[in-house]
Amino acid sequence: LLILLIGWSNPLELQAVIPEEGRGLNPLLQHPAMAIHPPSLYLGFIGFSIPFAFAMGGLIRGKLDNEWVLTTRRWTLLSWYFLSAGLILGGQWAYEELGWGGFWAWDPVENAALMPWLTGTAFLHSVMIQEKRNMLKIWNVVLIILTFGLTIIGTFLTRSGIINSVHSFTQSEIGPAFLVFLAFILVIAFGLLFKRIQILESEHKMESVLCRENAFLAQNVLFVSIAFTVLLGTTFPLLAEAVRGTKLSIQAPFFNTVTAPMGYALLFLMAVGTLIPWRKTSMESLKKNFAWPFLLAFPLTAFIAFWLRDELWSWDGYIIFWLAFFVCATMANELIRLVRLRSSQSEDSAPVALFMVIRRNLRRYGGMLIHFGAVLIFLGVAGKFFSLERDLTLTKDQAQTIGSYQLVFRGVSEIPVENAIHRAAKVEVLDLDGKRLQFLNPAKSFYPTQPQPLTEVGIRRSFWEDLYLIFSSENGESGDSVTLRVFINPLVGWAWMALPIFTLGIAICFLHRPGRLVARETVLKERFRAAEQALGTS
């Protein structure tokens, strides 16, 4: 970092020309999420350097047992959480500020943060196998090397200025330095891994195809495959331009088509992987754990199909709904079974039994809560498959119907704000019975420092869906007519609810203390007391 600051990007370097007035913060960044989103991503990126450093230290010493996994578990969890928070808040910012009706577009800068999150998630699951079964030691080191390397690639893509992105607000000359650093890190890390590969051999082997180890391994392969797909789709246009001089653009349909089946498989394994026993299981056990959740997901999905609009149909959306219901039903089945067992043995009430069940294995049920948050994100994505989009031209005081809403245009007004002027269309939102629900003010914002007006969307939020208005144009000089782009986005708000659920899940996981770590701390405390007593008597 010091070399970068001195050689490439000195923040204290004087400008050649001193402007009379600064341009101020880019208006697109004037959003509450921007106070948290960049620091969260930064903390997530640098946080993964800690388990990486411990792994490299173990390789250098030639001693890499499970100690480094236990010692860095909380750092890994915290880094994963901050990356997750950064991604969710970034999606919320894009949804509210960029004015296109969505929250994820597979933009290169979005992908830069997603890739280490994917491999970091794989690492979090894979180290459980090392802790429980002393397996996959080599794979875990590879995963943490890849995760740290992808944080460097992400920084390079974001800061180098070689890509066009709606999220890129600055350019610098530090890109080549990051590539040199990345190459140096990867050569040293994989060199150490190959040198010490004998000490990382697994102590056990897979005993059955149907076991939790294989479910986690399949999950790992899917996470890494998605990360590789995203990396390929993000960097291939750069490579093509460098080699052939041809400018290419890989758009969202490529990513959606390739990653969707892998995402569905991950959601399925989310239900199956946590309830399959270690080592091996039987078909009878599978039926016991998964039969009724598997069947219950079908009528629940049919209910959603009946509730959604008749003119909208999406196999992808219904597949996600079925998988989400399967995951939730599986988790509910597990909790109900354990609570009943606890109640029958101790005569505790159901709430007390639930508390005691969770308390006995905080890590497991904190992870289950995080899985539920991930299901909410998938449901938010599924809702976009049923999004309704229309361009409406509204005449003053006349209503038009879209979905379950009536929109009445009440005129255009100029609203001065602190550093801009909003030219807003006042739109009254009614239900189909004519009851007023809300006034929305989608606008064009004029900033003195910006050559073009920016879009300010109007959003009516509800538990089930968002009504999302974009002020496209004002028709005529009198302002008696406007054209709006209108979206009805089902379930999009559920994706934002994942963040507080992740927060609670991580907090519960942090309360878990591995027995071996507690024993180690006890030994250290006893040694410290003995040393104090020895010093006191000398």
Residue ranges and their predicted role:
Residues L1-S538:
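Solvent-exposed, non-transmembrane regions of integral membrane proteins
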